[in-house]
Curated annotation (Swiss-Prot):
It is a peripheral membrane protein. This is Nickel import system ATP-binding protein NikD. ATP binds at G37, E38, S39, G40, A41, G42, K43, S44. It comes from Staphylococcus aureus (strain N315). Coiled coil: none annotated. Disulfide bonds: none annotated. PROSITE patterns: ABC_TRANSPORTER_2 (PS50893). Residues 4-245 form the ABC transporter domain. The lineage of its organism: Bacteria, Bacillati, Bacillota, Bacilli, Bacillales.
């Protein structure tokens, strides 16, 4: 069963150039779904289109767009507590003038009616998931943390809301190998044990082959291959996909990322 189903998604710029060309995309419920492809293919554009968060100079059309079997009219109603977004611009998610504990508490209480103590309990739990301790984080400002620490705080700020769907654009790109694998292990645990759904854009093919159940391959704005993990491990693949897997452990990052 698909949690998101969008048909004939097309994205154009102001010069009427097609960046995404009429793709059909399903994000399967309670699975880790991945979108891979080379630099400039438009992967991040698809994520932003799903969130209705495209730059003003791009236009998006589709024939139908459903979330959990219902037609979507206003996606913003799902943000936070139902759909979480992990972007690459984690450094812009926190200001430098307020302690992180206060910012995280405000984020949680914006989405859930709760006491400060309840919010802090959820924050503490989420920070532990990303291998951080509240005592080391909550009384600090964002500029006092390393880039890797701040990215993990950002991921925790999404996880603490327990969204049904997480759209993650390069969620571990700035982390070292150990913490990157730990975060991916955590995301896999959330999907397998708690029934959440993940749509991940990544250039790390080792992560794709290890963690993902369903994969889309994007080339020049078109999906050229799709299938479950067994298809990509054991069946004959499109020549382009074979080259990606054979020659690149980690793809270059997208120009549009």
């Amino acid at each position: 069963m698909s949690l998101i189903d969008i048909q004939n998604l097309t994205i154009k710029n102001t010069c009427e150039k097609y960046l995404i060309k009429g793709i059909d995309l399903k994000i399967f419920s309670q699975q880790i779904n991945a979108l891979i492809g080379e630099s400039g293919a438009g992967k991040s554009l698809i994520a932003k289109a799903l969130l209705e968060y495209l730059p003003f100079d791009l236009s998006c059309t589709y024939d139908s767009y459903q979330f959990d079997g219902e037609n979507i009219s206003r996606l913003s109603q799902y943000y936070g507590h139902t759909i979480g977004y992990i972007s690459q611009n984690y450094a812009e998610s926190f200001n430098d003038h307020t302690k992180l504990g206060k910012q995280l508490t405000a984020i949680y209480r914006k989405h859930y009616k709760s006491s400060k103590e309840e919010a802090l309990s959820k924050i503490d739990k989420a920070l532990s998931w990303v291998n951080l301790q509240s005592k080391d984080i909550l009384n600090k400002y964002s500029f006092q943390l390393s880039g890797g620490q701040l990215e993990r705080v950002y991921i925790a700020s999404v996880l603490m809301l327990e969204p049904k769907l997480i759209i993650a654009d390069e969620p571990v790109a700035s982390l070292d190998a150990l913490n990157g694998n730990q975060v991916m292990d955590l995301l896999q645990h959330i999907v397998l044990e708690h029934g959440q759904t993940l749509f991940i854009i990544t250039h790390n093919l080792s992560h794709v082959l290890k963690y993902c159940q369903y994969i889309y391959v994007l080339k020049e704005g078109q999906i050229i291959e799709r299938g479950n993990i067994n298809h990509f491990k054991y069946e004959h693949l499109h020549p382009y996909t074979e080259r990606l897997i054979k020659y690149r452990t980690q793809l270059k990052r997208d120009y549009y990322d």
